[in-house]
Each structure stands twice: as structure tokens, then as C-alpha cells.
Amino acid sequence: LIGCIQDKEYHPEGDVWIHTMMCLDELAKIIKDENIEDEYRKLYLFYGILCHDLGKPFCTQEINGKITSHKHEVLGIEPSISFLSKLTNEKKFIETVCTLVKNHLAPFQLYLAESSLKAIKRLYLKVNIEDLCLVCLADCLGRDILDKDKCYKATEWLLEKAKELEIHNEPIKALVQGRDLIALGFKPSQKFK
């Protein structure tokens, strides 16, 4: 991340490392402001922000004077898994962090596209929307920009829509449960977790 350049229009603060450190600071403020006390939740939110741009070194390029990092959110999954696997063997934790990494741009993408409630429901099947909005907000605020109000627009919009659907802070429901696998003939094992 150190030395991985970013477009100065969107990231005047400098390289990806500086941006990531600023995002961590912003997330700490958000967690304090939101009175989030659950230690496990705080941990996966912080690791979500720490890992959110790990894909940038693999895709950053300069084209016609513009620096882009297309698909960095997807390319960040593999290095996130590699990093997190050195710290823990808790699959659920790693999956939660990687889901935040993979989807951290979604609130802005959905907002800018004025997406339907159906699209928001699809997102809900992948990630806790409230947690995602916290990571997205920290990402947006973790840079040297003057108009910080724009950071709140997308996340507030998405949370409002999710609240309409009553899915803003729902746990992700398992699409396949252990009993479904047993019914298919699988024997219970650690792989079920």
C-alpha cells in the first residue's frame, strides 16, 4: 500500500497507505459517535477498513493521465484472506471482513444509479447493510476532501431504503443450512461452519 499512487482528484492525501490510515481514524470516530460497544463487531469493521483497498496494488494504472484502480474491491479478497488467515482461523470472521471489502463501493454505486429496492435486497443477501455503510463512510471520510457532506449522502440514502425494507441491520440469513446438507447426504463435519 505504501507507494501505491492514487488519483489526486479523489485522493489528494497521498498513497493508499496514508488513505487507509486516515480511514482507520475516521472509523474510530464513527464507532465512538455511534456508540458501538460490541468488540467483535468493532474488530471486523476495523479489519474491513484495513483491508478495503488491498486490491489496489494489483490493478492501479495510469491511463491518459488518470490513475484508476478498477476492480480493486474484488482483487482485494485474495490478499485479505491471505492476511487474515495468518491472524485467525475463524472462517466466519474472515468471510465477514472479505464481504465488506468486496462490497465497500456498493453504497455509492447504488446511490449514483438510483437503484431499485430489489437491488438493495440483493445486496442485503451478501452483507449487513448497516456495517457496510459504516465502512463506506469511513472510506469516504478518510481522505483530504473539502466536501465531506457528500460522504453521508450515499450511506444515508442506502440506510433509509434498507429501513423501508426492514433489512438495515439484519443478520445475513444462511441460504443453505446444515440440515440442508445432511438431507443431501453430507456427513456433519468442520466444513459445515
Segments from the language model and where they lie:
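Divalent metal-dependent catalytic cores for phosphoryl transfer on phosphate-bearing substrates
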Residues: 15, 28-153
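A generic alpha-helix surface/boundary motif
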Residues: 21, 74-78, 114, 174-179
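Active-site flanking loop/helix segments enriched in acidic
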Residues: 1-24, 57-66
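Short linear loop/turn motifs
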Residues: 2-5, 97-99, 190-193
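Charged substrate- and nucleic-acid-binding regions of tRNA-handling and nucleotidyl-transfer enzymes
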Residues: 39-42, 82-86, 142-193
